[in-house]
Amino acid sequence: DLGVSAYRFSIAWPRLFPKGDTVREERGFDFYNRLIDALVAAGIEPMVTLYHWDLPQALEDKCGWANRDVVKAFEDYATACAQAFGDRISTWITINEPWCVSWLGYSNGVHAPGKKDFNLAVAASHHTALAHAAATRAIKVVCPDATVGLTVNMNNIHNESPEDQDVVDFAALNDSNLNRWWIDAF
């Protein structure tokens, strides 16, 4: 007995929809139903993250988050999860650290899928924001009282030279890219 009141876990999108389409893998749904039921039975609130670095390979093969089609696929996935689990889940996180997904995955290449293309990173940023909004709407249709949000990795932008306008502007640009894109859009 850990004495915890809540447990955050991620649902693996490929475990439920291996090809990223609408063809369900029932064994995946069964697994998460058992997990959620066990948490509820133990008096622990399940808190779900829908995306934490596990895009179905078929979607990545079509350029992943840099392809706008992923927005509809994510919305369909969120709808299916809300329908299957929403009677026991009140707190939903759509995407874990979308900045990392977009920039570290598509611009810097240090995270999957390891791309190094600024334009792909901008597209991925746009599509993760759209996917978050679409998933939020989809969950709210099924679970109107649910709390839905993002997990955002905030970065402290500290300006060492407030009298130097170039430094001030650069700090504002970094804050916009690292933080504001995600927290001010919603």
Annotate each language-model stretch with its function:
Residues 1-5, 16-186:
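Non-catalytic scaffold segments within catalytic domains of secreted glycoside hydrolases
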